[in-house]
């Protein structure tokens, strides 16, 4: 079961990184836009942390995505 959660965290992180790059934002810029720390956002992108719903909402707003897109 933990392998499944790990794979989901990694896939979500990779998707967030891809969307950030498509928006031409640096990690620091996205961190500032979402009031997240740069290291925490980096850990999310690397699949080391599962973000809360509040964090996903902040990321979706900053990246102009629907929250449902990040949760799918």
Kindly give the residue locations of the regions a language model identified:
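Conserved amphipathic alpha-helical interaction elements at protein-protein interfaces in regulatory
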Residues: 18, 22, 50, 62-65
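Short basic helix-loop element that most often maps to the first helix and adjoining turn
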Residues: 14-31
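A detector for short, charged/polar N-terminal pre-domain segments
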Residues: 1-11
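Residues within helix-turn-helix
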Residues: 28, 39, 68
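Residues that mark the N-terminal boundary/hinge immediately upstream of a DNA-recognition element
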Residues: 15, 26, 52-55, 66
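DNA major-groove recognition helix of helix-turn-helix/homeodomain DNA-binding modules
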Residues: 35, 54-69
